[in-house]
Amino acid sequence: MKRIISSSKSLKQLSNIGYGSKKQIHCKSVVDSDSDSDSDSDSDSDSDSNSNSNSNSNSNSNSNSNSNSNSNSNNNNNNTNNNNNNNNNNNNNNNNNNNNNNNNNNNNNSVFSELILKLIAERVILINNYNIEKIEEIKGIPELMKSITSTTAETKNNYYSGSYYSSR
């Protein structure tokens, strides 16, 4: 007895079909119970062809990417080694220059310290020769500074309050 059923193969063909294909699609077909095995065999062959094409494309892309990455990494390592050697040479030169500068500074410091000692000795003599009145004048300088700062504070307050203009 024959019966009309919707074919699962026709739905698969709808999903796999592209523009310009010549396959005819039947949404309904008259099938026996024996015709189910035919539809299964066709669907298996389609899936096999798709899987083979995918595996080939993947293997090619992997081989190319590996070769490029290896060559680049080797070049970079060589460059960094050369740069490190140059930096070490520069550091050695700088250390030699620093040693020379330190020796020169030590010589200059000894001359400079002698001059400072002479100047300090002269200043001590001058301070001892000052009169007592001069020393008292020097002591009065901080009090003078206090009075100057207080007057500037008053003028600022008067300026902002408006009495600065009224006094003029």
From Swiss-Prot:
Q: Where is the composition biased (Acidic residues)?
A: 33-47
| Stretch list, region Disordered | 1-107
Give the compositionally biased regions (Low complexity).
Answer: 1-15, 48-107
In its UniProt entry, what is this protein called? Putative uncharacterized protein DDB_G0283223
Specify the species: Dictyostelium discoideum
